[in-house]
């Protein structure tokens, strides 16, 4: 019997996959527990529609990420932050990803999750720093952050 898996089943199939399985296994285990449904023409066309919608959604996310990258990497986009520093240019505190995300929201009205900002260690020096941001698995942007003394 051909079934369409509605959930991942270890050792058998993944969600959205169409596979031939024994009749008894399909009726008594997979379909009964809601792990799969019978692969009828209606179910197959519904699955294809869902896959098209998911592809369209993924393409829109990628386009949004590319648009955001263009904005972030513009020469005019410099995130301005300030902090107290000593005479040698070292800060008393540090600048974290949360502060950078908040500054992006306030200065440029761009909402970026702080977890997407890839900062190896908090910034502890004054001046300009290039900070990478992972907008999408395929799109990474660099923003310039300027840390000035208060």
From Swiss-Prot:
<dbReference type="InterPro" id="IPR009027">
    <property type="entry name" value="Ribosomal_bL9/RNase_H1_N"/>
</dbReference>
<dbReference type="InterPro" id="IPR020594">
    <property type="entry name" value="Ribosomal_bL9_bac/chp"/>
</dbReference>
<dbReference type="InterPro" id="IPR020069">
    <property type="entry name" value="Ribosomal_bL9_C"/>
</dbReference>
<comment type="similarity">
    <text>Belongs to the bacterial ribosomal protein bL9 family.</text>
</comment>
<keyword id="KW-0687">Ribonucleoprotein</keyword>
<dbReference type="InterPro" id="IPR036791">
    <property type="entry name" value="Ribosomal_bL9_C_sf"/>
</dbReference>
<dbReference type="GO" id="GO:1990904">
    <property type="term" value="C:ribonucleoprotein complex"/>
</dbReference>
<dbReference type="InterPro" id="IPR000244">
    <property type="entry name" value="Ribosomal_bL9"/>
</dbReference>
<dbReference type="GO" id="GO:0006412">
    <property type="term" value="P:translation"/>
</dbReference>
<dbReference type="GO" id="GO:0003735">
    <property type="term" value="F:structural constituent of ribosome"/>
</dbReference>
<keyword id="KW-0694">RNA-binding</keyword>
<dbReference type="InterPro" id="IPR036935">
    <property type="entry name" value="Ribosomal_bL9_N_sf"/>
</dbReference>
<dbReference type="GO" id="GO:0019843">
    <property type="term" value="F:rRNA binding"/>
</dbReference>
<keyword id="KW-0699">rRNA-binding</keyword>
<protein>
    <recommendedName>
        <fullName>Large ribosomal subunit protein bL9</fullName>
    </recommendedName>
</protein>
<keyword id="KW-0689">Ribosomal protein</keyword>
<dbReference type="InterPro" id="IPR020070">
    <property type="entry name" value="Ribosomal_bL9_N"/>
</dbReference>
<dbReference type="Pfam" id="PF01281">
    <property type="entry name" value="Ribosomal_L9_N"/>
</dbReference>
<comment type="function">
    <text>Binds to the 23S rRNA.</text>
</comment>
<dbReference type="Pfam" id="PF03948">
    <property type="entry name" value="Ribosomal_L9_C"/>
</dbReference>
<dbReference type="GO" id="GO:0005840">
    <property type="term" value="C:ribosome"/>
</dbReference>
């Amino acid at each position: 019997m051909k079934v369409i898996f509605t959930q991942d089943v270890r050792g058998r199939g993944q969600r959205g996959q169409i596979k031939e399985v024994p009749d008894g296994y399909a009726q008594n285990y997979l379909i009964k527990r809601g792990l799969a449904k019978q692969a009828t023409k209606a179910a197959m066309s519904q699955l294809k529609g869902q896959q098209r919608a998911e592809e369209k959604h993924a393409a829109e996310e990628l386009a949004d990420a590319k648009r955001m990258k263009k904005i972030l990497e513009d020469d005019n986009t410099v995130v301005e932050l300030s902090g107290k520093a000593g005479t040698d240019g070292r800060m008393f505190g540090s600048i974290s990803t949360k502060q950078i995300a908040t500054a992006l929201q306030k200065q440029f009205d761009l909402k970026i999750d702080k977890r997407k900002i890839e900062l190896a260690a908090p910034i502890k020096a004054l001046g300009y720093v290039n900070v990478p941001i992972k907008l999408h698995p395929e799109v990474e942007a660099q923003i310039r952050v300027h840390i000035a003394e208060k």
